[in-house]
Amino acid sequence: MKEQNTLEIDVLQLFRALWKRKLVILLVAIITSSVAFAYSTFVIKPEFTSMTRIYVVNRDQGEKSGLTNQDLQAGSSLVKDYREIILSQDVLEEVVSDLKLDLTPKDLANKIKVTVPVDTRIVSVSVSDRVPEEASRIANSLREVAAQKIISITRVSDVTTLEEARPATSPSSPNIKRSTLIGFLAGVIGTSVIVLILELLDTRVKRPKDIEDTLQMTLLGIVPNLNKLK
């Protein structure tokens, strides 16, 4: 019971230490969030993302009046293959050559993100670049080259364009609000951890109760500080 009470008192003491230094914690949080905001706004160059979407039609589907569950499941599994084709070396090299990009295929691949919604045969291709018009130009060229490659390699009859890429009107990164919030939370958490560590490492006796907790003895009396009474 004694250890439980001591633990409760220690926890309360830690909260008191945090509350006592709340202004310091808040000040550090404001500084770190300001640094994060300034870094995201003035240092990191914004990037724009354009997305194009395609729909792959199986060769056998043209002879049917509609889709079956088996067709949908088979098509969904093939979409993963289409993703690898889109990011293949041949496709990337052709896009770089057609657009005369000052990029290597590996650099271009780092700008591309291919996503496949669950239980669909739709492939979304996103391209990020510092110039919005360049991002849309690369995305549309990639779609055209990849479509021909998919048709020539797999047993599909057509790759239909669902959505052409258009220049983005607002940057996709950096997320200034999120970066500022992360900076604020990092300041609060980091400063709080430092305060707690310093409090736990501080073995000085600050209260009469500390003597009882440390020596496990009952305190009989307190001698006042005469200098403070003058």
From Swiss-Prot:
<dbReference type="Pfam" id="PF02706">
    <property type="entry name" value="Wzz"/>
</dbReference>
<feature type="transmembrane region" description="Helical">
    <location>
        <begin position="24"/>
        <end position="44"/>
    </location>
</feature>
<dbReference type="GO" id="GO:0015774">
    <property type="term" value="P:polysaccharide transport"/>
</dbReference>
<dbReference type="InterPro" id="IPR005701">
    <property type="entry name" value="CpsC-like"/>
</dbReference>
<keyword id="KW-0472">Membrane</keyword>
<dbReference type="InterPro" id="IPR003856">
    <property type="entry name" value="LPS_length_determ_N_term"/>
</dbReference>
<comment type="function">
    <text>Required for CpsD phosphorylation. Involved in the regulation of capsular polysaccharide biosynthesis. May be part of a complex that directs the coordinated polymerization and export to the cell surface of the capsular polysaccharide.</text>
</comment>
<dbReference type="GO" id="GO:0005886">
    <property type="term" value="C:plasma membrane"/>
</dbReference>
<dbReference type="GO" id="GO:0005351">
    <property type="term" value="F:carbohydrate:proton symporter activity"/>
</dbReference>
<keyword id="KW-0812">Transmembrane</keyword>
<keyword id="KW-0270">Exopolysaccharide synthesis</keyword>
<dbReference type="InterPro" id="IPR050445">
    <property type="entry name" value="Bact_polysacc_biosynth/exp"/>
</dbReference>
<protein>
    <recommendedName>
        <fullName>Capsular polysaccharide biosynthesis protein CpsC</fullName>
    </recommendedName>
</protein>
<keyword id="KW-1133">Transmembrane helix</keyword>
<keyword id="KW-0972">Capsule biogenesis/degradation</keyword>
<dbReference type="GO" id="GO:0004713">
    <property type="term" value="F:protein tyrosine kinase activity"/>
</dbReference>
<comment type="pathway">
    <text>Capsule biogenesis; capsule polysaccharide biosynthesis.</text>
</comment>
<comment type="similarity">
    <text>Belongs to the CpsC/CapA family.</text>
</comment>
<dbReference type="GO" id="GO:0045227">
    <property type="term" value="P:capsule polysaccharide biosynthetic process"/>
</dbReference>
<keyword id="KW-1003">Cell membrane</keyword>
<feature type="transmembrane region" description="Helical">
    <location>
        <begin position="181"/>
        <end position="201"/>
    </location>
</feature>
